[in-house]
Amino acid sequence: MANHVPASFLTRANALFRKNLTYQKRNIWSNVRLIVIPFYLCVLLVGIQVLFDTQVNNSADNRCGCRCIHKNGDGKCERKSCGLQYSSLTQASFCAFPNPPPLLPLLQIPRPETRLVDPARSSCRRTGSCPVTILVTGNNHTLGETLSRNLLSTSFAVNSSDHFLRNLAYNVLGTISEADYTNYLDPGIHSDLPIFQIRPYCTPTTNLSFSFRQPPITFHKEVRCVQGLNLWRNNSVEVNDEIFKGYRQGNHEEIINEVAAAYDLLDTDRNKFNVTIWYNSSYKGNFKVQDRRVKYVRVPRSVNMVSNAYLRFLRGPGTKMLFDFVKEMPKQESMLRVDIASVIGPIFLTWVIVLLFPVILNSLVYEKQQHLRIIMKMHGLGDGPYWMITYAYFLAISTLYIICLMIFGSAIGLKFFRFNDYSIQFIFYFLCINLQISIAFLVSSAFSKVETASVAAYLYVFGSGLLGGFLFQFMLEGLSFPRGWIFVMELYPGFSLYRGLYEFSQYALKRQLNGSDGMKWKYFSDSAMDEVFYIIIIEWFLALIAAYYMDRVSSSAKDPFLFLKNLIKKSPSPQRHSLQRLGSSVSVEMEKLDVVEERAKVEQLMLESSTSHAIVCDKLKKVYPGRDGNPPKMAVGGLSIAVPPGECFGMLGPNGAGKTSFINMMTGLVKPTSGTALVESLDICQDMDKVYTSMGVCPQHDLLWETLTGREHLLFYGRLKNLKGSDLNQAIEESLKSVNLSREGVADKPAGKYSGGMKRRLSVAISLIGSPKVVYMDEPSTGLDPASRRSLWTAIKGAKKHTAIILTTHSMEEAEFLCDRLGIFVDGRLQCVGNPKELKARYGGSYVLTMTTSSEHEKDVEMLIQDVSPNAKKIYHIAGTQKFEIPKDEVRIAELFQAVEKAKGNFRVFAWGLADTTLEDVFIKVARTAQASNVFS
């Protein structure tokens, strides 16, 4: 039993969810292949890693240098000796160091132009005289000030160059030279830059030069004095804030304010020494592709300084902890190792994640191209349930996709995944796929063909990765590129995704190279991830809102900027709008009386706002704009008809007459150029979404899901009509029987295996399920055999008791059997309207006599007809067969039979027949007359 209460939001959402669940179950292997794509891509990364390692191992520059020390008789080397003495500078770092040389314990100090200074004293940067700043904090301010004064030595002595390293233990020396990758020579010594002596104050005598030997090289160095400035801060938060703001990206002015060291003395007192030391880990390297080894970082001198300060506090100024040198740990011979996943991770994973975008976009555009979206909407599925269920499906698939990516990547040992916090990664990927889905919904409104959408989507995929890797990353790492423009570039979704992946790769490299923690929540605000998160979240919501708006606009064929126009001028009400059209319309063509009467009836119904008719069309017009220099094409010209419940109104017309355009306007596929129509008192120009809840449609072409069965189609559309439980099952069984799809398990076969006729019958069953109040059928019996066609007609006739049906057809037999009234449509205009008998009586006031004789008796036949009816017309003649149209008012049937029997005595008549005017004759006559009048007009 039909439930005429419109289905609720949840009911429609449930219908779509269950349909999609069944559909995806039938396409399970396609979904599995999509989800396991990350596995193959991760394996590809491993393959690239193996290939890279093979190439690296074959290169002499990536291992310690060797020399052949013994050759055999054939000249082939039998024994090699490897070591520093045989290596180039490139090869040296890969050599074994069983006994590393001692290294000078220098303090890393900032360059003069980057040292932390008060803005009022920044002129020292130009002269190179800025002091070196050391920050100190702790729980005990007095103790902190005391230890600060003890950090730096007030004397400097170099007794002998032969004991230079030992003498260094009594002084604090530093260098502005960044440490290099070498672990046997300190760049602070073998570079041309001077060594700096850090003192509380400087005098001219504190600058000197000396020579010392570090076999096999003798160095000549200049020692310059630089003032050390110890500053107290209230707590570690202030220290952290000052250090962070000292980085170029930590302040809006992009000014570097660097400190040499910082100490938190915590709860240190005379009985306990507890200190935290800050140092600049960025000196370890910039982690670019070409710089994978760890740089030397001068932390030991910072430790020695605070230790000596505490000893002086306890034992007096003469106490010192001697610091002769530092040495690297002995190392074995090594080779270059690069983690490819971390190096190419950003560009590669950008492609991997964005690869879902074409899948989502193609799916959305396919439903629009095949009109599956609109046919669901025509049967009552609103935009809200469609969006909720479709979005949830894409989100579920995308979430499984990224989970598999993280699992597979971690399982095969990719450090990109293993070295970063999984929760941060998941949330980042989750936000990215939500933004990606929202953008796919937004962009889908701009495409009508899958091929075009697919090309654009893959351009976006590859463009995002390539531009990110070769443009965005270059600007990101460039110190001179404004940070504000980086933010602007990140507004492009592909670059915000790339930036997040870039941060993950950098933190993974840092952990690999210097043992840091990787990306953790505690470092979240120190990276650019918080900025990326904010951008993605805001764009996600904005894209979602814009996509929903554009979807509503495109589905209703409205101007995207209609909301702006509505703010300026309020739209008139539907009823007043139709009255205005009535008053302003002028017709210059002569119309038949029946058409004029139908128009007058429509005007009266519109004025009275009557609800007695389910469908009322008022001067409905559709004009398609001209293209390629052609004039505009009028498909429907001011059609006015009214159809009450229980009536089947048939539309006859030649191809191109405008029948399908009329159906498309009534079902919301196209927007009327002018005029309107009321369906159950709802205006199709204003309330189409409400109209859909009481409407059924059988389109000209079958819009079905190939993998769903006939029963599953009816289950889906029945639920949209608010049928439930036993009522739903009963309605489905009755529908299947009425269209002859219930036998031999046909109902449970996929629609893709149906013949054309079976698909047509299923489309009719879909349009009638749930007893809709209005049904549109566009050539419903096309492609059916006679038996199936007759069965289908019976089903349609039985369904029209409380339903208004508008039907288009080329079958006169179908029109006579089903239609209570007919309208003949030619060149976009209604030429006549009435029931089949009235039309035949009105346009068919003649008999058609057909007679076949030999060719020599054709004249005799003509004379016979002229004797019977002087006004008879010959309408057909070929090879002895002639047809004549005889006016009914000039002859009686009995007289005609007598005349033929008499003629048989004079010449041989092979065959003859007399027929009344058929509906086809009426149609041809009206169509020819209308087309002829259009030609002459």
Curated annotation (Swiss-Prot):
Subcellular location: Membrane
Species in which this protein is naturally found: Arabidopsis thaliana (Mouse-ear cress)
One GO CC term on file: membrane
Name of the protein in question: ABC transporter A family member 4
All residue ranges annotated as the ABC transporter domain in the record: 618-852
GO molecular-function term, one example from the UniProt record: ABC-type transporter activity
CDD domains named in the record: ABC_subfamily_A
Pfam families attached to this UniProt entry: ABC2_membrane_3, ABC_tran, ABCA12_C
Annotated ATP binding sites: G653, P654, N655, G656, A657, G658, K659, T660
Annotated family: Belongs to the ABC transporter superfamily. ABCA family. CPR flippase (TC 3.A.1.211) subfamily.
Keyword terms of this UniProt record: ATP-binding, Membrane, Nucleotide-binding, Transmembrane, Transmembrane helix, Transport
Membrane topology summary: Multi-pass membrane protein
Coiled-coil stretches noted in the UniProt entry, renumbered to this chain: none
Highest taxon of the lineage: Eukaryota
